């Protein structure tokens, strides 16, 4: 045993602990073995402890010769091992008490399932490579649609695995778990995305009762925690570049925080957007002669995922975005997005959950404090799609956030409003949604006319693509029985479109 390449990786004290531990587990390990195999296994476990080994001339099934193997004598756990061996052999021959040897059910042994010696626990922690499988697990399977991310993560994982492994893993015959292909993993995540599209808030607009939230969609489960971390890290890197003056002048904006709610930093890509008339007299909208940086590569990866995963239609692929970096107390006042941008558009939330208020008549109660008819919590990693009345009739705002937050809003510019220097991104052309698993829905009629979205790309609420019509044409229809039953998630007052009983204090 002392020449075994596997055992050479361990200290004598560790082998002793392993020997004692496995001796206690011997009844389970030797279950259903014949006496000779049981005896061979017992001797092999005992031989793990070199401090108590002695040369022995006994042979076990002809495997051990004089001086070639050792049997541990006078071990502290010898008595317990022999007892369970005798008891096991006697009962197994009689066909009795077989179930008593399942994990955690040994009545005659001292060990209790779930309890490990402290020394042995430390050994396990110090030897993580021993219990790992030989094949590395891809940490970036979540970004399955992007080959470059998969390859990068595979290389990193292989380097970490190779540095941890101190032995030839191929010598261990560990059964491999069945692997899913990248397409299978992506499809599994795709069909598990939750999509809420039945927001209702009835308000009187121009003398008519309308659902001002018609067209809103909330998609959760689109971005994994790993993907979110990578995106947030990228945003902070861009923020540092902006602060160092390494981005174009109008790309990064960091206003002086002169009052509560006025310190939000922004990063714009694809176009420069003016929220209000500026000092030069430019009206709100896209500034066609102001130059900003193009979309970063990772942001284009996000856009492709939004299209492929049926969050945005392929007829409205975003070509610009704005990143909002909130500090505690920052906010966005009530507004309707300028119609220089087409509908639908979307915003993704990172770092922390916050509420977004909707209503045709939002009120400013104080710095960063607003009230409205309907409040929607935006979970971390969620995507809120604005279309129809939800984009053009109801205003929206973000009250002062209680903690740090990042949001990225992706929008497609009207071609007539694009900057004079703008060039469409080649890798954002011809993106198609991934096929959906029709068997999961139980009805193919829900997915009819999958790519019929020509009505969604309109400017203004007078000619908009039409809220839930976007869903009814079959772009994506989740399992309504589970994902649209929101009685436990949304207060009844919100479902009826009534104001909340009390206004939340965002201070």
Curated annotation (Swiss-Prot):
Region (Disordered): 76-102, 145-183, 432-507
Biased composition (Acidic residues): 145-160
GO CC terms of this entry: P-body; plasmodesma
Biased composition (Basic and acidic residues): 89-100, 174-183
Annotated EC: 1.14.11.53
Swiss-Prot/TrEMBL cofactor(s): Fe(2+)
Enzyme class: oxidoreductase
Protein name: RNA demethylase ALKBH9B
Gene from which the chain derives: ALKBH9B
């Amino acid at each position: 045993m002392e020449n075994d390449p596997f055992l050479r990786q361990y200290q004598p004290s560790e082998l002793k602990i392993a020997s004692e531990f496995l001796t206690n587990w011997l009844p389970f390990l030797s279950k259903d073995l014949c006496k000779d195999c049981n005896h061979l296994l017992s001797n092999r476990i005992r031989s793990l402890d070199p401090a108590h080994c002695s040369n022995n001339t006994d042979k076990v099934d002809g495997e051990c010769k004089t001086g070639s193997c050792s049997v541990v004598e006078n071990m502290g756990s010898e008595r317990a091992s022999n007892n369970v061996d005798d008891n096991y052999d006697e009962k197994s021959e009689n066909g009795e008490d077989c179930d008593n040897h399942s994990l955690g059910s040994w009545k005659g042994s001292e060990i209790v399932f779930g309890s490990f010696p402290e020394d042995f626990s430390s050994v396990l922690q110090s030897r993580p490579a021993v219990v790992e499988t030989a094949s590395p697990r891809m940490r970036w399977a979540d970004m399955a649609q992007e080959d470059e991310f998969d390859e990068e993560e595979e290389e990193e994982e292989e380097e970490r695995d190779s540095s941890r492994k101190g032995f030839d893993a191929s010598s261990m015959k560990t059964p491999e778990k069945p692997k899913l292909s990248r397409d299978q993993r992506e499809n599994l995540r795709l069909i598990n995305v939750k999509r809420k599209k039945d927001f209702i808030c009835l308000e009187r607009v121009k003398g008519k009762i309308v659902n001002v939230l018609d067209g809103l969609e909330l998609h959760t489960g689109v971005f994994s925690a790993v993907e979110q971390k990578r995106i947030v890290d990228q945003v902070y890197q861009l923020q540092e570049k902006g602060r160092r003056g390494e981005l174009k002048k109008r790309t990064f904006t960091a206003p002086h925080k002169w009052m509560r709610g006025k310190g939000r930093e922004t990063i714009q890509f694809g176009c420069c957007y003016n929220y209000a008339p500026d000092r030069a007299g430019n009206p709100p909208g896209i500034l066609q002669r102001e130059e900003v940086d193009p979309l970063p590569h990772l942001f284009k990866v996000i856009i492709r995922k939004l299209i492929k995963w049926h969050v945005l239609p392929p007829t409205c692929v975003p070509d610009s975005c704005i990143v909002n970096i909130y500090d505690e107390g920052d906010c966005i006042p009530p507004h309707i997005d300028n119609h220089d941008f087409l509908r639908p558009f979307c915003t993704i939330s990172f770092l922390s959950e916050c509420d977004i208020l909707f209503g045709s008549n939002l009120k400013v109660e104080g710095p960063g404090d607003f009230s409205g008819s309907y409040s929607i919590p935006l979970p971390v990693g969620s995507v809120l799609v604005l279309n129809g009345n939800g984009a053009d009739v109801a205003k929206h705002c973000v009250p002062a956030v209680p903690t740090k937050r990042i949001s990225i809003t992706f929008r497609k510019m009207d071609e007539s409003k694009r900057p004079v220097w703008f060039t469409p991104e080649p890798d954002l052309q011809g993106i198609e949604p991934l096929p959906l698993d029709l068997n999961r829905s139980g009805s193919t009629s829900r997915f009819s006319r999958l790519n019929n979205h020509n009505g969604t790309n309109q400017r203004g609420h007078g000619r908009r693509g039409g809220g839930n019509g976007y869903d009814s044409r079959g772009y994506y229809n989740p399992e309504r029985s589970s994902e649209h039953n929101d009685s436990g998630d949304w207060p009844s007052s919100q479902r009826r479109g009534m104001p909340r009983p009390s206004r939340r204090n965002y201070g």
